[in-house]
Amino acid sequence: MTIILEVNHVTKRFGGLTAVNDVSFVVNQGEILSVIGPNGAGKSTLFKLISSFLSTSSGDVRLAGERINNLAPHIVARKGVVRTFQETTIFRSMTVRENIIVSHHLRSRASLWGFFLGSKVAKADEHSFGQSADNIIDFLGLQAIRNELASTLPQGHLRALGMAIGLATDPKVLLLDEPFAGMNHDETMHMVDLVRRLRDERGVTVLLVEHDMPAVMKISDRIVVLNFGEKIAEGTPLEIQNNERVIEAYLGSEDAAIGM
């Protein structure tokens, strides 16, 4: 297998608090890898370190061998590590299609402001970006809401739009931040299918943080488990379900069920 992303002995300290402590793992190209752990385990902090929204105290993160930690987040995104957010990248006054078109600015010759101000370079890109947006809409099954304002969308459609925005940037590794949060069972299973299709049909490597353990166990090739900022386990879903350290970490927590 080809390694696409490496997390090497990454540590993050906030004053006297160590939020992430000497965490290492690799993500193989074309893999779906989940990061789980009880509340406060350091999952969100780790995601921010990988996407460079936080700087590492020590250690490094590498994309295809190139060190990317502590670069500006937009540079990391341009290199191919793209993080989806829980609505913060969505322009609520724009339609679904317009949001996807605007998100192409990460790989455009024009700036984002160029799209708003109508620069010549932006106009030259507009047609191809429109076609790409339509392809993404078709791929994710968003045709029925393509012209709906983002502000009117229910939770499941907002999650799908967030995924579409990430996909529009042509990522090598897509970081999904709680993609199943707030969804019912049917919506979750639909999103699980979409994530699999991203990998199988688009060749996107997926790294996700999620609390929905049944969904994690269903979708993941491998799982990394954090507790108190440290990696305590790594393996297949079956190996994680039967790992005594993982079971002990979850016992007595709000996340006690680990999806067996």
Each language-model region and where it sits:
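Glycine-rich phosphate-binding loops of nucleotide-dependent enzymes
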Residues: 1-260
